[in-house]
Amino acid sequence: MSNVVLIVYDPRMISKYLGQKLHMGLVADDIIKPTAEIAQQIFANFVRLVLNVSESSLTTLPLSANCDYDPELHKKSIPIIILFQCMKAFIKDNSGNKLDLTMCDLVTPAKHEHRFRKLTSFLVDFLKLHELATPAFNEISEEFSDRKFEMEKIREELLEAEKKKNDLLAKQSIRKRHEHELINEQSNAKAELKNVVNEYTETRQINEELDKQKEEAILHIQALEKEMLTGKKTIEHLNEEVLTSPEQLKQEMEERKRHIEELRDCLESSKKGLQAKLEAREICINSEKNVPVIIEKIHQWTEVREVIIDLIDVESENLRKLKEMEEQLDFMMKEMETAQKRLVEQSETHEQLRIEHTQKSEERQRRIEEITEQIANLKTSQPDVSQEIAKKKQELLALKNAHSETISQITNSCQDAVAKFAKLNAMFKETQKVAFEKNTAAAREMERLKSSLTGRLLSDYTFGSSTIDAGENTENCDPQPNDSSFSVFK
């Protein structure tokens, strides 16, 4: 802005152009010999119509500055101060520091006619530039809005594509994991099937051996029956013969009787052994029938075991996330405490500045009253001393300007402090809300995991006592669920 060229226009041209653009009935005399009302009206209309500042913003002090003052006393001064601050910043920013607005330009513009003409010429220049640049600016703004809309649309499409990509990757990982699980289940099933086939082969061999033993026992029983018939026939034959030696015959009969008793005991033991082998054969047949059910239950237990392992992994991950969230919450609480301490320190600093400002304001007010009293005394007692009166007025205006500058600085610092506090408060509330939601979600997930993991493993099949031999059952093959509650947290 250092290459700004200031042009001073003719008063008639200035009055005509400003009158058209600012909707005012101006004449050349209003620019040559301006009054305070005309100057304030020109700047106020410029701020409202060109800079688009609302009427309420020109009459109301911002934020905390709008307190601790008498509205009736400052009814006229507040709009002038706000208008002065707005136009001063505008002229300083756009004139390359070649022009500067003072309070005298608003209160007593007639004393500096050439300066007021420069200011109005600057406003005319800006209005011309504004009139030329507005169509191009609107066109660029529309094009920028269209491009921005297109960029937003493209960004949404990219986000949607990224989301679809992530979903596909997640589905792919789930599918691969499911394939690995199926492969593991297939390998386990093959191993179980191999074991069952081996058991079936062993059972078949045992059945064949039992059949052989049964046939041998039947042959042995037939042989015993033949011997019994032979013994009976021998006894009958001996009864028919003449007893030549009764003692010898009696002894032979006793021996035959003992032999028959031994054969009978052997027959009973053979029958019992055969009955036990038949029962073992029935048990093997029933076990062969129950092999598919056992395989199915093994598969179910394998799936339940995988689900339990997955739930344990999910629980560990949730516990880790919960620990991280607690650490983040502690960190944010520490940051909030630090911010509160800083806020308290800033409040104390602001309070100290306010006290100093109050003291300085009282001192300035007292000085203003003294100068006003001196001016009144000079007017009544010494009317010829106009130079000293003007000097006192200049001092009074300087004090007022310094007071206005101090008020604006304090207002800006208060606005910054309030904005920082609002930002910190919003950040703390948002962090607290997110932490509470995450903590609640983690607690719910923990309860859900506990409720899902502490339940029974359902089973529809149980072995009966008639299908398993108590003498050969050395391992606990009963798949019936235990009454004790299962829990991974024990």
UniProtKB/Swiss-Prot annotation:
Entry's Gene Ontology molecular function annotations: microtubule binding; protein-containing complex binding; structural molecule activity
Record carries keyword Nucleus: yes
Keyword Iron: no
Coiled coil: 146-280, 310-407
Chief location category: nucleus
Keywords: Cell cycle, Cell division, Centromere, Chromosome, Coiled coil, Kinetochore, Meiosis, Mitosis, Nucleus
Domain of life: Eukaryota
Compartment(s) of residence: Nucleus; Chromosome, Centromere, Kinetochore
Disordered: region residues: 346-365, 468-490
Cellular component terms (Gene Ontology): kinetochore; microtubule; Ndc80 complex; nucleus
Role: Acts as a component of the essential kinetochore-associated NDC80 complex, which is required for chromosome segregation in mitosis and meiosis and spindle checkpoint activity. The ndc-80 complex synergistically enhances the affinity of the ska-1 complex for microtubules and may allow the ndc-80 complex to track depolymerizing microtubules.
SUBUNIT field: Component of the NDC80 complex, which is composed of at least ndc-80 and him-10. The NDC80 complex interacts with knl-1.
Full protein name: Kinetochore protein Nuf2 homolog
Gene that specifies this protein: him-10
